[in-house]
Design a protein with these regions (language model features):
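Short, polar/charged alpha-helical segment
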Residues: 76-107
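Extracytoplasmic/periplasmic substrate-recognition and gating elements
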Residues: 348-418
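C-terminal motif of bacterial Sec signal peptides marking the signal peptidase cleavage site
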Residues: 15-18
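Extracytoplasmic "Venus flytrap"/periplasmic binding protein-like
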Residues: 105-182
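Glycine-centered hinge/linker elements that transmit conformational signals in sensory
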Residues: 235-240, 270, 275-319
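Conserved C-terminal helix/tail region of periplasmic/extracytoplasmic solute-binding proteins
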Residues: 388-395, 405-491
Length: 491
């Protein structure tokens, strides 16, 4: 056997030598041509990025930049979490990596501190810090609603006055930031790649893929892509999904529903229709939306989905209560469930059946795009306290942090954690990208009299908005009276 192998090897070597000799001239010619070509090609210089243009003297000699934060989740430090506490958590590690890059670039140390033990009192705590002349904090990262309240209490610098901060850069969220500025000219807070909790606070509809298939319904992804995922199509699916499974004539937690939500659903559906309830005139006076389309939308919701006799709809804060109602979707007895994106991981752990993610529907196909309301208590925004006199320095630091977040926090939070690690299919990944890129800010979304009125409509199933307009307008004017003193509108 060895002799045969040796003979074959000798024959192979002779053949290779023959080929090599016959082709040597061709190889030499090709090599020479390649050398001539490479010699004639000009050397390309590496592409210059924004970070390369940062002035060389933007260094801060080991300064500690302290960020004060507050969210309803006491463990959600998205600014500078302790690495020992986030090791193994892909998002926390990405925040740490972002900070290391920014710290090295600027010669700083980034630190964070919780502003309050109770997230509901953060405005009071910020006021106390400002009145005491506190200068420890370089920036705040707090729920957007509380940041708005801080802005009309004179606690924040207008970001327009920070020359080193450019909110037109790609790493800032342009449309959302314009809405947060009340479509005016004054920015007191900003969102971008630097913070991810606003993405976690985006509203979405979860759907049971197994049940959808079992009912003979098409998964709605293509409808979304084609711009056909509308309120009408959504209601068709809801209508076809409910059933009195035990046949006792009473709908409870043991039966099947088309949609599970709570009384806050109007502040998710209305923004998905592109509707802002609280608006402002060019002089900064608060206005309640009284357009015909707005009233049509309210009527559609109250005569359909919110009708007390409409069995396919289950309100979690209705007679059944949260404890029982919250078993229905995870256990496969509801087609749709409306909530925030941050609930994905919980469903992944609790559900045996596969689920997908969708945006809330458009009102009609003519609506130009989908919108995603986001919870302004959970969703955060960055701002600069009025006691911080180092605006140029702060602007550079926030810009650099946001810039480095593009390749650290964003891919970790969105691509790896939510879109790959948590979501079970690539189609839902596409849906989440759509949600995050189309967040919609509604000032009346949380904490206002308008919010309370919309909750009342949802829980009662009665549209009394028009009849309550006089009292709503009066309260609304009082709530937002200070806006015109801080925000600029018109020309």
């Amino acid at each position: 056997m060895k002799r045969i192998c040796a003979a074959l090897l000798a024959s192979l070597m002779l053949a290779l030598c023959a080929c090599s000799n016959s082709e040597i001239n061709t190889e030499n010619s090709d090599a020479a041509a390649a050398n001539d070509l490479s010699a004639s090609e000009p050397e390309t210089e590496p592409e210059t990025t924004w970070i390369d243009t940062l002035p060389a003297d933007v260094k801060y000699d080991g300064l500690t930049f302290l960020i004060g934060w507050s969210t309803p989740d006491p463990d959600s430090d998205e600014c500078a979490p302790d690495i020992d506490e986030v090791t193994g958590d892909i998002v926390g590690e990405s925040v740490h990596q972002r900070n290391l890059l920014a710290e090295e670039k600027l010669d700083i140390s980034i630190a964070s501190q919780k502003l309050t033990e109770s997230w509901t009192t953060v405005l009071t705590d910020m006021k106390a810090l400002i009145l005491a002349g506190d200068t420890a904090y370089g920036a705040y990262d707090v729920g957007t609603w509380f940041m708005f309240q801080a802005s009309i209490n004179g606690l924040l610098h207008p970001l327009n006055s920070v020359e080193t901060l450019d909110l037109s850069n790609d790493w800032w969220e342009h449309d959302l930031n314009n809405m947060i500025a009340l479509d005016g000219k004054t920015h007191y807070m900003a969102n971008g790649m630097i913070n991810y909790l606003d993405d976690y606070g985006a509203s979405c509809i979860y759907f049971n893929k197994f049940l959808c298939t079992d009912l003979g319904l098409e998964h709605p992804y293509e409808m979304v892509r084609n711009g056909e995922w509308t309120l009408d199509r959504f209601l068709e699916y809801v209508d076809l999904s409910s059933a009195d499974l035990d046949g006792n004539g009473i709908y409870d937690e043991h039966d099947r529903y088309g949609m599970v939500e709570n009384s806050g659903l109007l502040v998710r559906f209305l923004p998905s229709f592109g509707t802002q309830v609280v608006q402002f005139s060019e002089s900064g006076e608060p206005i309640i939306n009284q357009t015909e389309i707005f009233y049509d939308q309210l009527d559609r919701m109250t005569t359909g989905l919110l009708d007390r006799n409409y069995k396919p709809m289950l309100l979690r804060d209705g007679p059944l209560g949260y404890e029982k109602a919250d078993t229905v979707f995870p256990e496969g007895r509801a087609l749709f469930f409306g909530e925030m994106v941050r609930n994905i991981r919980g469903f992944r752990e609790s559900m045996e059946q596969d689920f997908g993610v969708l945006p809330y529907p458009k009102y009609t196909e003519e609506q130009p795009r989908y919108y995603s309301s986001y919870n302004t208590a959970w969703g955060t925004s960055y701002g600069i306290p009025i006691t911080n006199m180092e605006l140029d320095r702060t602007g550079w630091i926030l810009e650099v942090m946001c810039y480095y977040s593009m390749d650290t926090i964003y891919p970790a939070t969105i691509e790896k954690n939510i879109l790959t690690k948590t979501v079970r299919d690539e189609e839902s990944s596409d849906m989440l990208r759509l949600l995050f890129e189309n967040k919609f800010y509604e000032l009346g979304q949380w904490g206002t009299s308008v919010y309370g009125n919309l909750l009342s409509i949802a829980s009662s199933g009665t549209n009394n908005f028009a009849s309550s307009m006089k009292s709503i307008t009066k309260i609304n004017a009082k709530e937002f009276a200070e806006v015109k003193n801080y925000y600029k509108f018109g020309n």
